[in-house]
């Protein structure tokens, strides 16, 4: 509060409270008299902050949100190019997307919960693994440590922004987190086994069979990861569709299966059981990612049938066939000789069997007639409920990353 000012000679006097009255009059013009009186204890910075909020235009601020301002009806929701408010999660249109999000949360696990003691001892033992077995472990950790990062980048930088459905976006966020967990798992394995981290993480630059798969995937994310890229035309919508086929049907649906089969086969033989346990969890996560992506692709086809023309079908077919060939080359590189009860020829048959499934899942003709599955146990493990342990077929605490036994 201002005080009375009086000069000692008595020639000048200011009435008590005069300065306070003047201050109130000036400030009240900006923030309101009542508010000012209540906030006399506020600092100048707080007064400025409150004044700025008084000037906030709510309508202008909310106009920046994606979609309209009206309440959302189910029929207004679409997979791409939706104009409804994307911040209104409910009502759900795609219940399957929300269920996958819930299932993913229930299946949460963390790499450090897996005991790597036996793996470390086996890896350090010069007689513990053959050279071919060591090659398989290193090649797969090298490929997967990069591949899951590529998938995560594609989700975060492109797919999340371009899929215009909130329940699907909710699952995409969960998937991106799971990709981070998978990269964490590979790092945990590499660190636990005291591998040369530079060699493993740079393998996609140095090993041709790994580099070609990475380069193939990256070309499909280059354009849509541009912040200026927008869907809304036939060509840009098709570009997004190509990306979804590349990353869900090929990267996660084909490129991962040679490595999964090799590492899980080691686990079945009681070798590298900690690494194999983590790969089993990752396979279960990736199976759900794959199924989600296929559902998204098929829903886009239903809502936009003009996109799925003869040209697009041929492109999608070629993408899956190219991916299959790249994975066959990778199998030959990682298995120059028979190992773990399998060889490159058997893996080629398996990959063609998988490719037929991917083609049929998005409504395309199978291109490898007469192929069969030489590894039926892989189908069994993929088809299990998430809470089941393939090797013991008993209920486990997968929700808390409970350890699996490979006996």
What are these regions (language model features)?
Residues 6-54:
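N-terminal intrinsically disordered, low-complexity tails
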Residues 27, 34, 44-47, 53-56, ...:
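Short, flexible helical or helix-coil boundary motifs
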Residues 50-69, 133-135, 304:
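Membrane-interacting alpha-helical segments
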Residues 59-123:
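Amphipathic alpha-helical packing elements
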Residues 127-129:
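Long, low-hydrophobicity ectodomains and other hydrophilic envelope-associated domains
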Residues 131-407:
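Non-heme di-metal
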